[in-house]
Structure formats: structure tokens, C-alpha cells
């Protein structure tokens, strides 16, 4: 009996390994990018505290009350003269004089708009001068610098600092006065329309 010995040259196993290597895809490695922050990290938004902001006084039920009043002084002649006193002596407006002003201990007028509404003919001549007396001491017009032409409608606004309206006044004390005087004819020239912004406090 003869014995045959088969020798393997190793090519078959190599081919198998190559095939297996081809079938297995190489694992991909993804690079990791790290971003360095140059500035400080952002903080989340803070919630606003519930309640009034600092520096502001919350309103209470017993605080001051603001009102706007409008009235007129009619049938002003071109040569008329007189004064309007604002406070308990405001006889031109009984609703203020004998009404709301008597319901509070203190008041202050913070704005006054004096408007002249013309009713004169276009050919009428003359003007009506006016003067502000913030302390109710003058009894007659002393200056004619400020004036309304009787043929034109015009207005003038007086803020609180001009009419003694920064401080509270007792309800039995007048605050300011406006004096006026015309140099026209005796016929009707127009009327005054007056708007007041008033603060009231300490009800009776």
C-alpha cells in the first residue's frame, strides 16, 4: 500500500481570509469637534418678582383723585375787564365751587387751559389782554403783553408750576387768578372756555 500525502500551499486559506476581510467594512471613526467658548456662559432669564417695581408707590384706595372740569365765561364784550379766581371763589362754575370742592379737604389745580373763542366779525378791531396772578394778590391788570385778538380763536396753557399747583391747598383757600381787559368795542367779542385738571384728596 502506498500512502499519498497532500500538502496545502496555504493559498486557499489566504483567499478565504481576503474574502472575509472584503466583506467586513472598516469601522468609520467620526471626529469629535469641541468648540471653545471665549465668553462667559449665558444665564437664563430671571423672572420678575411679583409686585410693584422699586421706586414706584402703589396706589391705594385712599389716594388722591383726578378730575377734569370744563366751563365757559360767555358774552365777553370787546371792552370788558375783570378776573377769574380759581378755588372756592370760582363763581363762574358753581359745580366746582359748591360741589366737588366742598367734598374734599384739599385740592390742587395742576393744569389750566384758557381758550378765547372768537364771536366777533372779521372787521372788528381790538384785543383782550390777560395776566396770570399765581398768588391771588392783584386786583387789576398790570400788563398787556399777553393778549388774544378778538377776531381769532386762541389758547394758552398754564402748567402746575406757573399756577401754584405743586402744593396742596385747603379747600377754603383760592389757588390762583387770571385777570383780563379788552380794548375793543362794547359789542360781544367772544367767550372764554376754561379746562382745569384738578387733584383732590382727603374726602370729608
Curated annotation (Swiss-Prot):
Gene Ontology, cellular component aspect: T=3 icosahedral viral capsid
Record bears the keyword Transferase: no
Example of a GO MF term: structural molecule activity
Alphabetized UniProt keyword annotations: Capsid protein, T=3 icosahedral capsid protein, Virion
Gene3D superfamilies: 2.60.120.20
Chief place of localization: virion
Lineage: superkingdom: Viruses
Compartments in which it is found: Virion
InterPro entries: Luteo_coat, Viral_coat
Biased composition annotated in UniProt, kind: Low complexity: 27-41
Biased composition regions of type Basic residues, renumbered to the chain: 13-26, 42-57
Biased composition (Polar residues): 1-12
Pfam families: Luteo_coat (PF00894)
Stretches for region Disordered: 1-74
Family: Belongs to the luteoviruses capsid protein family.
Function: Major capsid protein.
Note from the entry: The N-terminal region like those of many plant virus capsid proteins is highly basic. It has been suggested that these regions may be involved in protein-RNA interaction.
Protein's name in the database: Major capsid protein
Amino acid at each position: 500500500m502506498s500512502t499519498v500525502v497532500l500538502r496545502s500551499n496555504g493559498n486557499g486559506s489566504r483567499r478565504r481570509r481576503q474574502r472575509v476581510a472584503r466583506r467586513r467594512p472598516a469601522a468609520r471613526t467620526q471626529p469629535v469637534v469641541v468648540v471653545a467658548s471665549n465668553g462667559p456662559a449665558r444665564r437664563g432669564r430671571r423672572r420678575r418678582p411679583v409686585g410693584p417695581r422699586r421706586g414706584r408707590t402703589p396706589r391705594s384706595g385712599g389716594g388722591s383723585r383726578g378730575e377734569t372740569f370744563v366751563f365757559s365765561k360767555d358774552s365777553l364784550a370787546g371792552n370788558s375787564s375783570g378776573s377769574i379766581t380759581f378755588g372756592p371763589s370760582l363763581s363762574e362754575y358753581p359745580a366746582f365751587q359748591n360741589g366737588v370742592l366742598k367734598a374734599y379737604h384739599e385740592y390742587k389745580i395742576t393744569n389750566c387751559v384758557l381758550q378765547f373763542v372768537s364771536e366777533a366779525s372779521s372787521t372788528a378791531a381790538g384785543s383782550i389782554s390777560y395776566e396770570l396772578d399765581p398768588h391771588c394778590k392783584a386786583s387789576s391788570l398790570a400788563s398787556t403783553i399777553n393778549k388774544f385778538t378778538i377776531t381769532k380763536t386762541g389758547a394758552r396753557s398754564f402748567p402746575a408750576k406757573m399756577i401754584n399747583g405743586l402744593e396742596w391747598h385747603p379747600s377754603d383757600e383760592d389757588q390762583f387768578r387770571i385777570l383780563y381787559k379788552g380794548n375793543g368795542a362794547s359789542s360781544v367779542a367772544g367767550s372764554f372756555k376754561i379746562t382745569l385738571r384738578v387733584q383732590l384728596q382727603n374726602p370729608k
